[in-house]
Amino acid sequence: MRLKAQILGIKAEDFETEQISADDAQYTGRTELYIPEEMVKEFKKKGISTENLYQSDEEGNQFLPELHENEFVILTPDQSAKKTLLGRVSGNKVVPLAFKKSKPYGVSPRNVGQYFMQEALMTSAEEAPLVILKGMAGTAKTFYSLAVGMEKVYNNPTGEYRRVIVCRPNAQFDDDIGFLPGDEKEKIAPLMRPVIDNLEQILDSDEKRRYEDEEELGDKITEIFERGIIQTEAMNFIRGRSIARTYLIIDEAQNMTPNQVKGIITRAGQGTKIILLGDPQQIDKPFLDERTNGLSYAAKHMIDSSLCWQITLSAEECERSALAMDAIKRL
């Protein structure tokens, strides 16, 4: 439609119903609150009511901001600000993290955002069937999602998931991959190289499973794919299916349209967990922007859903090299 309008010299605009507001775009899934010092022990045992928590304005007035279901919280004791506590909004309470001490496939959180991300990913599909992770490149979204997937499927083959499926929208080519040579796996191989890179890092980072050389590591990755523990599929082949008991990672979801995201989420089968990953500020798809892409659209409409957990990783939580961070800021 845009192309037709451009040819005819007519201005084309997005549907207002598919745009998110500037305020919605700023929702990060996390907030900071103060907790009375005397209630710290109670929080650690069973959580506390949100009525006991507060923020302070510049004049020192205390107030409780609007909180959303499953919003993550950094709690600071009001008498000892040096040590913070991590929790999550559940109904009218803030409860402590259940998986704070977990190390999925030997991976440990390195910052607050990764603790929150781990909590959302490790929680069962019954309680958290949809997880939305936003953040710039280098915040370990794909890495951590794969690590938890490996923990849930490879280390626990009789557990809740039968497999890990990874998809990426085809932003580099045309929407239809049919014109590319080879079978489905050969067609999507260029899109999935980042998945292999992250998997190599995960496998090689576990001290209990260190591999002696590149060949041994490559053989292990081949085994994982041949056994169907991790599968990669084109987005075109996912839509229309009902996938059960699957840990489904949708990488680079900011390059999907709202309709594509809706088509994926509404077809989730029993026991399936869907993880949407991406950076709304890094869009490669023509005609999509920060406010009209599928990732932002889903994040907006799933706020306050008890079945959706979402978190935005900050730039300070990027785990890439100092050069990469400096380039991101300068370029």
PLM regions with names:
Residues 249-250:
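Hydrophobic residues in beta-strands of the RecA-like P-loop NTPase core, especially within AAA+ ATPase
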Residues 13-100:
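Interdomain "pre-motor" coupling segment immediately N-terminal to P-loop NTPase/helicase cores
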